[in-house]
Every structure is written in structure tokens, then in C-alpha cells.
A protein has these predicted regions:
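Bacterial N-terminal signal peptides that target proteins for export
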Residues: 13-25
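Short, Lys/Arg-enriched N-terminal segments with co-localized hydrophobic residues
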Residues: 1-13
Length: 378
């Protein structure tokens, strides 16, 4: 999905705090004679505790490859040094697992879609901030049939996808466009890491993947894409979410993350040797070549410039799109068993607009740091 929804088998070991303070023993002077023959001792200063390392998790998706590239290219270090924070960027092999780790506090920030930010950490009670909207899926997520011609042919088939992710949402929107319902298909939960292999199995009849897996599946025998996210522009958003508590306590971290992101995206958008080199590196990091990666970028409406991202963040369209997403999420039971209404979880937007319970805001779209980037104040 636009990364979307984009799940790792392994956890991450966080950097451990240094413990213990070294103290040198000091010999007592008993007299001038003893002092003259006794060995000298040095008094050591207690070591300062190590600075906290903030961990940012990412999974493979065209719109999220700037993060590992920024780490590789030294851009993360540059902005970390500027703001006096220690940032570690780590890959998680499974998208849903990355969000579970964020929810559990093992990651301070993570790449996510708007829907998954709502239905995983926010629904679990974790106050979450969408620090930056990076892109929206403009064809990066799709429904692919095996041996079918149109979306109507999906009726009665099992459909493999990352359950309860934006892939699930895309399927629902696609079915709606074809006059079908979710009860017309059977969802088979499949990790994003396994979905390409799953399509090759005889029993698999339909899948809903995102790039780069979508591109690979479309090349396979019998594959036919019958619907994609370009039909619902602006609804599947990808970006970086951060713990609201962490962001409030460490504004320099948020500033550094915004600086890292926009320096990297503006570089990759350059139509020169430097821009091409950045895109080539991102392609390699995502397991494809330059042509393959640039093909994926064509179906990713990426906000390379902070001014464009700011406009999207403060637009009324953001509220409209997320209203559709939250209604689907509640209907699908993704708010949890205790949720009684679509308004149980509050979502706050720029300007103070809130969808849902204003006393239980758990997802926030904060334009503060995008605004700083747009104003050149980072």
C-alpha cells in the first residue's frame, strides 16, 4: 500500500542506557613519609549518562525509501547533530509488526498510513501524531485477479491481503464501486512480505498488494489489475507518525525529522546527477532498479516540497478523506470490541477541527514542523 498498510517478524533492541558511575579510589595521606612512597591515585569524574537514542522504524514502500537513504547518505547524522539528538533509523520486515512495536513503545516513530495509525496505535489508546504527510497512493495499491477480466469477477473468490490495513480499505472501496459487498468475498490474511509468493500458489485467486509487491505480481502469469488507488485519490495517505508524548517532550527531535525528510525528498526530486544517484540508491534499498523504482514513484503522489505538504495538511479534503476512513474502520470492527460509536476516537486536524470525541483525541495531524520547513525555519 502506500506503504500503506505496509508487517516484521523480528523486534528491535533499543539502545540501552549506560549504568553505573566510575569512581576512583583516593588514597588517604597518613604522613609526609607515606605520601612520598605511596603510589599516586587519580580521581575520575563520573561519566555522564548516554543520551537517549530515538528509533524510527520503516518498511519497504516506494514513498518511504527516503528514510533508509537519508541514514545511508549521512543526512540523518547531519540533522541529528544540528539539533543535538541521536536518531536511529531501522528497517522492520513486517509492516503490521512495525506498528505494533510503535504502539508498545519500542519505536518512537514509524512509517504508517493514516488508516493504520488510527486503527492500531490510536485505537489501542496511544496518543499519536502524524508528523508529516509524505504522499498519497495514486495507483501504488491495487486489486489483482488471477484469470479474471473485471472487478466483478472477484465475487466469490478468496482475497489475500494484509487484513485490517489500507489494503482492506481499498478492497472495500473497490467492491463498492462494482456494486459488491465485503460478504461477496473471503479475506485471507497475508503478510506483505509473503504476498508475492502467495499469488504464485494455485489456491490464490485474488490479492490486494502495494508497491513494490504490486509491480512484481502484475508481471506474473494470469495477473490482471482490476482496481487501484488512483480511483480514490487522497484517501490512502502515507507518512511518519510519532508518539505525541515524545514529540511534545522533545521538539528538537521533531524538527530534526522534518529536516531529514525534506532535505531528502527535495534531493531525490532533482532532475540532475545528484537526484538520479539518490533515486538509484533508494531503488537498490527497495530491491529493484532505477527504472522499477521510478515506475513506482509515478503512482505515488509524493509531496517533495514542504509547501505542497503543508497545503495538503491544512486542506478541508484531509478531513473529508479521514472521515471516510474512520467510518470504514469502525464498521469493520477496527476500533476494538469496546467501541460503541464511530466517534469513540477523536481525530484532531489543523485549526482545531475534531472528528469524534474531543475528550479522547488519539490521532493528531499537526502542521507545526511542516510549517517550519515551508518557512525555511528549521
Amino acid at each position: 500500500m502506500t506503504g500503506e498498510g505496509r508487517s516484521a517478524e523480528q523486534g528491535i533492541d533499543m539502545t540501552k542506557w549506560l549504568t553505573g558511575v566510575k569512581v576512583a579510589a583516593t588514597a588517604a595521606l597518613v604522613g609526609l613519609a607515606l605520601a612520598a612512597c605511596s603510589p599516586k591515585t587519580e580521581t575520575k569524574t563520573a561519566a555522564a549518562p548516554a543520551a537517549k537514542t530515538y528509533t524510527v522504524g520503516w518498511t519497504i514502500y516506494a514513498g518511504w525509501m527516503p528514510w533508509p537513504y537519508a541514514e545511508q547518505a549521512g543526512i540523518v547524522k547531519k540533522w541529528s547533530d544540528k539539533y543535538g539528538v541521536d536518531i536511529k533509523v531501522v528497517q522492520i520486515n513486517d509492516y503490521v509488526e512495525s506498528l505494533n512495536q510503535f504502539t508498545a513503545g519500542k519505536l518512537d516513530a514509524v512509517t504508517s498510513t493514516n488508516m493504520d495509525a488510527l486503527t492500531i496505535p490510536a485505537a489501542a489508546g496511544k496518543d499519536t501524531t502524524f508528523l508529516m504527510i509524505g504522499d498519497y497512493s495514486n495507483g501504488n495499491d491495487g486489486i489483482v485477479l488471477k484469470g479474471g477480466a473485471t472487478l466483478a469477477d472477484i465475487k466469490g473468490r478468496p482475497v489475500n491481503l494484509v487484513e485490517n490495513s489500507v489494503s482492506h480499505y481499498l478492497l472495500a472501496r473497490g467492491l463498492e464501486s462494482a456494486g459488491l459487498k465485503m460478504t461477496d468475498v473471503k479475506v485471507v490474511n497475508t503478510s506483505d512480505a509473503d504476498i508475492v509468493a502467495a499469488f504464485g500458489a494455485p489456491e490464490t485467486k485474488a490479492v490486494v498488494p502495494w508497491n513494490p509487491q504490486l509491480t512484481e505480481i502484475k508481471k506474473m502469469p494470469g495477473a490482471k489489475q482490476v482496481f487501484d488507488s488512483s480511483k480514490i485519490p487522497g484517501e490512502i495517505l502515507d507518512g511518519l507518525i510519532i508518539s505525541t508524548e515524545v514529540a511534545k517532550a522533545n521538539p528538537n527531535l521533531a524538527k530534526a525529522l522534518a529536516g531529514i525528510w525534506y532535505e531528502t525528498t527535495m534531493l531525490m526530486n532533482q532532475q540532475d546527477a545528484a537526484g538520479q544517484a539518490a533515486r538509484e540508491a533508494m531503488a537498490k534499498l527497495s530491491g529493484t532498479d532505477l527504472a522499477g523504482y521510478e515506475s513506482q514513484l509515478k503512482t505515488t503522489y509524493l509531496y517533495y516540497d514542504p509547501k505542497a505538504a503543508l497545503a495538503a495538511t491544512i486542506s478541508p479534503d484531509l478531513v473529508t478523506a479521514n472521515d471516510k476512513v474512520r467510518k470504514f474502520s469502525f464498521t469493520a470492527g477496527l476500533f476494538g470490541q469496546g467501541a460503541k460509536s464511530v466517534d469513540d476516537i477523536g481525530i484532531e486536524f489543523p485549526g482545531g477541527k475534531i472528528l469524534g470525541d474531543p475528550k479522547n483525541v488519539k490521532l493528531r495531524f499537526d502542521p507545526t514542523y511542516v510549517q517550519m520547513a515551508a518557512d525555511g525555519k528549521l
